């Protein structure tokens, strides 16, 4: 599904990361972790073919950017303006209009053949139901909560039946219940639809129970493995090149700190 072999990204003359090797299969859920500036979003852009990368970056056996019709993408975002009156269902329909990233111009449905229009409507309704958004999909998007908006954006990314789903900070700015709900949704889509998922996350806590592996980026390189193997004092000390401690609190959440007293600003929940 996704293959990186000795991949290297250079942005503005700086090597962001190099020698990355990763293979992601159908139905696998991977989180990409690391400090700010470590190249997490750059990795997703390289997979999309939006950032040049050396080495091998392939999706569905094709060079990055050649198989984007098979890729769903949810970029970083801010909440929609409360005054925005476009409906959630219309936001989802944008996912059918073109294979380019960003906000495409919606197709004018009255110009389409009736059969095609009916098929579009059926697929949009199907994917809205898949993400559990049927109850509010016809509301203005600005009236929806953050979690509801994110479900609709995930539906937009899934409407073309992608084989690979890329999510950039999909839980950012959501409240804790919404984070839990969206995390469970992503896992359900991954398993039931056999979609490979690569998700950039600043806080792995909400998705930790669902992950197959994590890729932790720092200092231009990465360590890859199960959460239990990677989020450890030993593994992260080797990665950062300094002494790092992974601390667990009374409810099982993990905090990663360097010594003597400089926090690395990562909080994780251990996977037991």
What are these regions (language model features)?
Residues 33-35:
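The feature captures the beta-strand-to-loop junction immediately N-terminal to the Walker
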Residues 52-69:
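Conserved ABC transporter NBD signature motif
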Residues 106-136:
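Conserved ABC ATPase "signature" region
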Residues 140-144, 148:
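Conserved ABC ATPase signature
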Residues 161:
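Conserved catalytic motifs of ABC-family nucleotide-binding domains
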Residues 165-169:
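Catalytic Walker B motif of ABC-type/P-loop ATPase nucleotide-binding domains
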Residues 233, 239-272:
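ABC ATPase nucleotide-binding domains
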């Amino acid at each position: 599904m996704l293959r990186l072999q000795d991949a290297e990204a250079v942005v503005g003359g700086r090597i962001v990361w190099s020698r990355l090797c990763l293979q992601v299969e159908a139905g696998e859920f991977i989180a990409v972790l690391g400090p700010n500036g470590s190249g997490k979003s750059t990795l997703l852009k390289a997979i999309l073919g939006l950032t040049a990368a050396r080495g091998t970056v392939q999706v569905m056996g094709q060079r990055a950017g050649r198989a984007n019709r098979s890729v769903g993408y949810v970029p970083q975002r801010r909440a929609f303006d409360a005054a925005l009156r476009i409906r959630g269902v219309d936001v989802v329909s944008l996912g059918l209009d073109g294979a380019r990233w960003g906000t495409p111009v919606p197709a004018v449905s009255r110009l389409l053949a009736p059969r095609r229009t009916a098929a579009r409507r059926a697929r949009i309704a199907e994917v809205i139901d898949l993400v559990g958004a049927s109850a509010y999909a016809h509301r203005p998007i600005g009236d929806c909560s953050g979690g509801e908006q994110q479900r609709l954006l995930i539906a937009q990314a899934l409407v073309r039946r992608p084989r690979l789903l890329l999510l950039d900070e999909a839980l950012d700015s959501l409240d804790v219940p919404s984070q839990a709900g969206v995390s469970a949704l992503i896992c359900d889509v991954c398993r039931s639809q056999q979609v490979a998922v690569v998700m950039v996350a600043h806080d792995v806590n909400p998705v930790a129970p669902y992950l197959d592996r994590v890729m932790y980026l720092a200092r231009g390189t990465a360590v890859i493995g199960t959460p239990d193997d990677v989020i450890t004092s030993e593994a992260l000390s080797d990665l950062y090149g300094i002494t790092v401690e992974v601390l667990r609190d009374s409810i099982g959440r993990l905090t990663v700190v360097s010594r003597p007293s400089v926090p690395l600003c990562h909080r994780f929940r251990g996977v037991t």
